[in-house]
Amino acid sequence: MNGKDDMSIISLLARSKKRISVLKSLEKEDKIPTKIGKDINDNSNHVSKYLKTLKDAELVECLNEEDKRYRFYSITDKGKYYLDKVEKEYSD
């Protein structure tokens, strides 16, 4: 990972605790947005926006794009790497 990429992704995550919460939720198992929303106490519309941002950054992936109703998401290796990095840098 290059330094510029590192900083932009770390900044993306550091600006939103909810994005970090989504990644943490997906660490345990692959989930649909509704289940992630329950885990992080947010509605599925917001979760879908977080997932789009995380997907664009290649931190999560949709496992079944063709299914319009029950899309399962998974954290990528890149997502795990940056989640760990952000947690280490920003833990009190």
Named regions from a protein language model:
Residues 57-68:
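Beta-hairpin "wing" of winged helix-turn-helix
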Residues 1-21:
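Short alpha-helical segments that sit at the start of domains
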Residues 20-24, 81:
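Pre-recognition alpha-helix immediately N-terminal to the DNA-recognition helix
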Residues 42-56:
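Short amphipathic alpha-helical interaction segments
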Residues 17, 28-32:
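Short capping segments at the starts of secondary-structure elements
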Residues 35-39:
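A short acidic, leucine-rich amphipathic alpha-helix
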